[in-house]
C-alpha cells in the first residue's frame, strides 16, 4: 500500500490582495446497484458512471459499500446456529468468485479508469485474500495510481460470518491536492474511537460508503460532519428486486414481503454534508443516479473556529487514544538465520 509520503501534499493557498485562491472542489457520489454475480459487468457499469461524473466536472467520485462483489443484503448462505447447509456453501462459492484480489486485474482496470477520467476514485469492493473475504474501500488517484485500501474493522451482525476483520494497518488518510481523504464503512461510523483516529489524521473528505439506507442514518452523517469538522460523503446503493438473483432465498422473507420486480430493497439516501452541518446534496431516496456538490474547503477552518475535537477542544491529559497500526497476522514464519540474527542483537 502506498503511503502518504508518495502523494502530493495539499497545495498551500497563498493570499493575493488579502483573498485566498478558490478552494472549491466538485465531488460526486454514485448511487447505483451492483450487477450481482458478474464483476466484469459491475465494473463496466461503474466506468459509465465515472465517465458521466467526470464529464460534469467531478474531481472525486465515491461508490457505495461493497459495490464490486456486492453487498449480500438478505443472502442466507445457509446460516443457522449449528447447521451446515450445502446450498449455502454453493452460494458462498459464487460470492467468493465475485470478490477481487487487491492488487489484481480489476484494481488495475479501476486505476486506469481513474486516470482516463482524471478523478480521485473511492470504490467499495469485496476483497479476497485466500478464502477470507473483506469489506474494503479502494483509493485511486487521477494519475492512475492505486493509493491503498481500508478494510472494514468490524463487520456488523451476520456480516461477521462471511467477512473477516480489518486491522490498524489499513486506516489511511491520504494527503491530496483536493483535501485529506479517508473512509469509514457503514456502522464503523458508529465507532467513536475509529472516528477519532480519522480526525487525528486530519481527514477533510470523510467518505462513508454504507448499506444503511435508513432515514436515521442521516442524523449520524450530520453529527460526524459537525464533530469532525469535515465534509461527509455518504454513498448507499439504490437496489430493486430485479437487481438481485432470481431466487427466493436470496432475500429474508420477513424483511421483504413484496417480491415485485421493481420493489425497492435498498432505498439509497446518499448525501453530502458540510462541516457546518449544511446538507449540500441529497439525500436521494428515489432512484439510481449521481449526487453532486461543489464544496468549499474553507468551510473546514470556519467550522473549527469553535470546535476541533482533536485540537483545541481536546483534553489529552484526561482522555487519550492509542491506535495499533501494526498488521495482525495469524502466522509468522521465522527462519533459523533470522532467529540467530535476532538472538545476536539481544
UniProtKB/Swiss-Prot annotation:
Alphabetized Pfam families for the sequence: CN_hydrolase
Residues annotated as catalytic: 65 (proton acceptor), 152 (proton donor), 186 (nucleophile)
CN hydrolase domain: residues covered: 25-297
EC number: 3.5.5.1
Catalyzed reactions: a nitrile + 2 H2O = a carboxylate + NH4(+)
Keyword tags: Acetylation, Hydrolase
UniProt modified residues of type N-acetylserine: 2
GO cellular component: apoplast; chloroplast; cytosol; plasmodesma
Tissues where this protein is expressed: Expressed in cotyledons, hypocotyls, leaves, roots, stems, flowers and siliques.
GO MF assignments: indole-3-acetonitrile nitrilase activity; indole-3-acetonitrile nitrile hydratase activity; nitrilase activity
Gene3D superfamilies cross-referenced by the UniProt entry: Carbon-nitrogen hydrolase
Entry annotated with the keyword Mitochondrion: no
Coiled-coil stretches noted in the UniProt entry, renumbered to this chain: none
PROSITE patterns to which the protein is assigned, alphabetical: CN_HYDROLASE, NITRIL_CHT_1, NITRIL_CHT_2
GO BP term (any one): indoleacetic acid biosynthetic process
Complex formation: Interacts with DEK3.
Recorded family membership: Belongs to the carbon-nitrogen hydrolase superfamily. Nitrilase family.
Protein's name according to its UniProt entry: Nitrilase 1
The gene coding this protein: NIT1
Amino acid at each position: 500500500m502506498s503511503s502518504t509520503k508518495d502523494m502530493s501534499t495539499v497545495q498551500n493557498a497563498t493570499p493575493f490582495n488579502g483573498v485566498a485562491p478558490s478552494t472549491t472542489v466538485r465531488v460526486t457520489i454514485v448511487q447505483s446497484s451492483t450487477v450481482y454475480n458478474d464483476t466484469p459487468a459491475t465494473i463496466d457499469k461503474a466506468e459509465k458512471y465515472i465517465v458521466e461524473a467526470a464529464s460534469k466536472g467531478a474531481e472525486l467520485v465515491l461508490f457505495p459499500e461493497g459495490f464490486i462483489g456486492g453487498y449480500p443484503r438478505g443472502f442466507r448462505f445457509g446460516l443457522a446456529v449449528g447447521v451446515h447447509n450445502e446450498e449455502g456453501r454453493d452460494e458462498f462459492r459464487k460470492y467468493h468468485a465475485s470478490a477481487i484480489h487487491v492488487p489484481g486485474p480489476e484494481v488495475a482496470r479501476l486505476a486506469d479508469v481513474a486516470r482516463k477520467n482524471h478523478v480521485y476514485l473511492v470504490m467499495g469492493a469485496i476483497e479476497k485474500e485466500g478464502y477470507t473475504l473483506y469489506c474494503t474501500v479502494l483509493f485511486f488517484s487521477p494519475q492512475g495510481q492505486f493509493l491503498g485500501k481500508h478494510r472494514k474493522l468490524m463487520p456488523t451482525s451476520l456480516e461477521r460470518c462471511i467477512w473477516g476483520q480489518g486491522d490498524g494497518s489499513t486506516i489511511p488518510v491520504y494527503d491530496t491536492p483536493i483535501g485529506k481523504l479517508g473512509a469509514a464503512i457503514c456502522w464503523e461510523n458508529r465507532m467513536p474511537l475509529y472516528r477519532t483516529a480519522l480526525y487525528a489524521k486530519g481527514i477533510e473528505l470523510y467518505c462513508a460508503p454504507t448499506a444503511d439506507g435508513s432515514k436515521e442514518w442521516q442524523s449520524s452523517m450530520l453529527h460526524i460532519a459537525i464533530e469532525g469538522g469535515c465534509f461527509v460523503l455518504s454513498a448507499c446503493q439504490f437496489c430493486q428486486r430485479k437487481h438481485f438473483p432470481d431466487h427466493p432465498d436470496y432475500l429474508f422473507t420477513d424483511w421483504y414481503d413484496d417480491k415485485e420486480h421493481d420493489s425497492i430493497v435498498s432505498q439509497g439516501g446518499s448525501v453530502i454534508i458540510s462541516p457546518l452541518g449544511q446538507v449540500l446534496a441529497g439525500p436521494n431516496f428515489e432512484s439510481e443516479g449521481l449526487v453532486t456538490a461543489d464544496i468549499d474547503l474553507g468551510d473546514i477552518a470556519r467550522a473549527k473556529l469553535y470546535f476541533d475535537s482533536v485540537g483545541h477542544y481536546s483534553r489529552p491529559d484526561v482522555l487519550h487514544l492509542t491506535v495499533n497500526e501494526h498488521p495482525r497476522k495469524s502466522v509468522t514464519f521465522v527462519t533459523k538465520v533470522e532467529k540467530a540474527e535476532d538472538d545476536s542483537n539481544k
